[in-house]
Structures are given as C-alpha cells and as structure tokens.
C-alpha cells in the first residue's frame, strides 16, 4: 500500500532564517509492508531520478534560461548521523556542539565533504538520535539511542525527513509513556494501531527547499 500527497504545511516554528517558511508545500510519500527503512530511501532515490530526467527532457529551454545544471541523482551515498558528525569534525577541524542534531553549518560541511570525496550532490544521513525524532519514529533495535530514520541533504541542505514508523500498538504506548506524554486526544490515532498496522514508513520533501537548491538561490523565499 502506498499513499502520495502534495499539500500545504503550516508550522509554528521560528522562520526568520534563509531556510524556513511557516507555510510550505510538502511532497509526502507513505508506504506499507516494508522490510526496512532503506526501502523508503530507495523509493526517494527513484523519484529524484525520474524528476531530474523529466526536467531534462521537457524543460531544457527553461533550465538553460535559468542557467540550472541538474544534479546527479544516479547514486546517493548514505552515512550514519554519528559518523557524519565525526567526519566533518575531523576533516574541517570543527567541534561537535550538539550531539542530538545537525547544525546548518554541519549540514553544509557534510554536503561539501561528500561532493569533494564522492562527487555526490545528495547524501542520506541516517540513524538520527531518538531524542531528536518524533515519538512514532522506530528505534534501531541494535541501539535504541538511534532511530531507523534519515534526512536527505541536497548540496548541504536538508530537503527531506523520513524513516520507519512504529507499527506495534504496545511499543507505541511505551514510547509515549517514556516521553512523558499523555494519550488523551490521541485515542482515534492509537485505535488504528490497536487493531493491526503493517510495518510502514514514509517521508516528506520540502518543495520550496528542493526548488531553491535546484536554482542555486540563497534564500528559500526567493
């Protein structure tokens, strides 16, 4: 089972930066009956390959006018979150200040590193810390400090967040309890898991960020 959606997203977060909008367009993909979160990454890779091919074939004139050189999505490397932090800290002599998230500068340096070392325009950063991800993100059974999730960086900017979700009802309740959250108001959501839910996952692509990086703009509002 697969669900695809293009729709507006409204976010109550700080947006006085070059990369944030409080209203943006999201391309959402959700997949059921998966064996691994890597299937979701493979699906996004295929989507990007299709999208770049379509742009090249149908919009060559517009790309020439805008002086856009399409990125290479034929192969997208992946690196664990903790490994990525260590790589850029060592390579660029940078101190790790936040062990639970990537700072914008770190994202840019990861993109730079993989461009220099592998000539890659995109890179998946996987296994984000559980503290950073929503309660429904599935923890890595081999190390529950991390999750079976990922971000996709395009030229050093996060354009996608995705991963595998918890599908077991009791595991979901435990995660909610461990987070100190209340289930009040979530009954309808939780009931769908009580009666059975297949292993599933998905992702969201920020369309404005993707477009910004394709055009080489410095500000998402442009």
Provide a role label for each language-model segment.
Residues 41-48, 169, 208:
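Hydrophobic face of alpha-helices
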Residues 43-155, 178-191, 195-196:
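Metal-assisted phosphate- and nucleotidyl-transfer catalytic regions
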């Amino acid at each position: 089972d697969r669900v695809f959606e293009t729709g507006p997203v409204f976010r109550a977060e700080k947006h006085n930066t070059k990369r944030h909008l409080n209203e943006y367009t999201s391309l959402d993909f959700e997949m059921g009956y998966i064996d691994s979160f890597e299937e979701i990454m493979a699906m996004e890779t295929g989507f990007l390959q299709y999208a770049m091919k379509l742009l090249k074939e149908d919009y060559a004139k517009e790309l020439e006018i805008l002086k856009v050189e399409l990125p290479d999505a034929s192969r997208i490397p992946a690196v664990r979150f903790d490994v990525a932090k260590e790589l850029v800290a060592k390579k660029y002599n940078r101190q790790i200040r936040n062990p639970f998230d990537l700072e914008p500068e770190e994202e840019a340096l990861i993109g730079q590193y993989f461009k220099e070392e592998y000539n890659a325009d995109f890179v998946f950063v996987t296994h984000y810390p559980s503290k950073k991800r929503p309660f429904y993100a599935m923890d890595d059974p081999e190390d529950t400090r991390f999750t079976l999730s990922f971000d996709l960086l395009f030229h050093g900017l996060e354009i996608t967040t995705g991963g595998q979700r918890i599908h077991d009802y009791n595991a979901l309740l435990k995660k909610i309890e461990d987070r100190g959250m209340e289930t009040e108001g979530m009954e309808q959501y939780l009931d769908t898991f009580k009666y059975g839910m297949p292993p599933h996952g998905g992702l969201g692509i920020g369309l404005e960020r993707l477009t910004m990086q394709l055009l080489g703009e410095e500000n998402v509002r442009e």
